[in-house]
C-alpha cells in the first residue's frame, strides 16, 4: 500500500472517531437544553458518523488492485459512497425541517443554554480544523471521499456557528420561535451541501470530463511538445478516485516505422506520467499525418512535405477534445 493511501485511510479513521465523539457531546447538549436547533446539529453529526463508516469502506475497497472483473480498479466506489452520504445529508435536513416546524407550532422552553453554547463552540472548532485538513489532503490526493468529508465537516462548522448565534438570541430575547427558525434556516444550508456532494459524485460516476485536468494536459503538452507530434486529438479523461485513465489520438509523420512511432508514444506518455506522479494509465492511438497538415508541421527537413510550414497551431482544450486531426478545417 502506498504511503499516501495509508495516510488517506488513517485520516478517514480519525474522521470517524472524532465524529462519534462530537455526536455524543452534541446529543448531551440537546438532552440538557431541549433546543431543536442543537438537535439539528446532532442529527447532522449522525450523518457524519455514517459517512465516516462508508468512507472507510470505500477507501479500503478502492485501494484493491485491478483484477479481471475490474480492469480499471475499484476507485468508482468512492463516488458511490459519496453520493449516499449526500442523500443522507439531505434526508437529515428534511427531518430537521419537520422537527423545527413542530417546535414552531408547539414552542418549548430551552434549559441550560450556556452549557449548550459552550459545547457547540468547542465542537465547531474541532470540526473546522479536521474539515480543513481533510479538504487539503483530499485535493492533493484527488480523493473524492476525503474532499466530501472535508466539505461536510466545514459546512457542519458554519451551521453550528449559526445555531450558536440563534441560541444566543433566544437567551437574550426569550423568543422561543427563533430556536426553530434558526434550525429551519440551517437545514436549507445543509440541503445545499448534500446536493453539491451528490452532484460531484454523479459527475464521477457518469465520467464527466474534468476540464481542469484537461487544461493541465494542454499546458504540459504545449510546454514540452515535440516536432514529431503533429497533433493530439480525441482526448478523453476518466477519473478513478485520483487515478486517471487517458485516451487520445497522437498524430505523427506517416512515413516513420512502427518502432519509431512507438518511441514517440513512449515519450508522450512519459511526459504526462511524470506530471500526474504516476497516477495515470494511457490508451494512445497512433495516427499518420496527412498532406493538409504540412502547413502545421515543424519538421523542415521533410522530403515528403507538400506545403510550406505556415504557423504553429496552439493546442487548446477544444482542439484536443475534438475527434478530428488539426488543420483539416
State where each predicted segment sits.
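Alpha-helical transmembrane cores and adjacent cytosolic helix/loop segments
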Residues: 1-216, 320-326
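Peripheral (non-transmembrane) domains and long loops of multi-pass membrane proteins
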Residues: 1-12, 197-329
Amino acid at each position: 500500500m502506498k504511503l499516501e493511501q495509508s495516510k488517506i485511510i488513517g485520516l478517514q479513521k480519525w474522521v470517524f472517531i472524532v465524529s462519534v465523539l462530537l455526536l455524543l457531546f452534541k446529543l448531551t447538549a440537546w438532552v440538557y437544553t431541549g433546543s431543536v436547533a442543537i438537535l439539528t446539529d446532532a442529527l447532522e453529526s449522525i450523518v457524519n458518523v455514517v459517512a465516516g463508516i462508508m468512507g472507510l469502506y470505500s477507501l479500503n475497497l478502492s485501494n484493491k488492485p485491478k483484477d479481471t472483473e475490474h480492469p480499471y480498479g475499484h476507485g468508482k466506489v468512492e463516488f458511490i459512497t459519496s453520493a449516499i452520504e449526500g442523500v443522507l445529508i439531505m434526508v437529515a435536513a428534511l427531518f430537521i425541517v419537520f422537527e423545527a416546524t413542530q417546535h414552531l407550532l408547539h414552542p418549548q422552553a430551552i434549559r441550560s443554554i450556556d452549557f449548550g453554547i459552550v459545547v457547540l463552540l468547542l465542537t465547531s472548532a474541532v470540526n473546522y480544523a479536521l474539515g480543513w485538513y481533510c479538504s487539503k489532503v483530499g485535493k492533493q490526493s484527488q480523493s473524492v471521499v476525503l474532499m466530501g468529508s472535508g466539505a461536510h465537516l466545514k459546512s457542519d462548522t458554519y451551521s453550528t456557528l449559526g445555531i450558536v448565534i440563534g441560541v444566543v438570541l433566544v437567551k437574550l430575547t426569550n423568543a422561543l420561535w427563533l430556536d426553530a427558525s434558526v434550525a429551519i434556516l440551517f437545514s436549507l444550508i445543509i440541503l445545499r451541501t448534500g446536493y453539491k456532494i451528490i452532484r460531484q459524485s454523479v459527475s464521477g460516476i457518469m465520467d464527466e470530463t474534468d476540464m481542469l485536468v484537461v487544461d493541465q494536459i494542454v499546458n504540459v503538452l504545449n510546454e514540452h511538445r515535440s516536432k514529431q507530434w503533429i497533433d493530439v486529438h480525441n482526448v478523453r479523461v476518466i477519473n478513478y478516485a485520483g487515478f486517471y485513465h487517458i485516451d487520445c489520438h497522437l498524430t505523427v509523420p506517416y512515413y516513420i516505422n512502427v518502432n519509431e512511432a512507438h518511441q514517440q508514444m513512449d515519450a508522450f506518455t512519459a511526459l504526462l506520467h511524470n506530471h500526474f506522479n504516476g497516477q495515470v494509465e494511457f490508451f494512445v492511438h497512433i495516427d499518420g499525418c496527412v498532406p493538409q497538415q504540412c502547413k502545421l508541421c515543424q519538421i523542415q527537413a521533410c522530403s515528403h512535405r507538400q506545403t510550406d510550414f505556415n504557423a504553429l497551431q496552439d493546442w487548446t482544450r477544444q482542439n484536443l477534445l475534438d475527434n478530428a486531426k488539426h488543420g483539416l478545417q
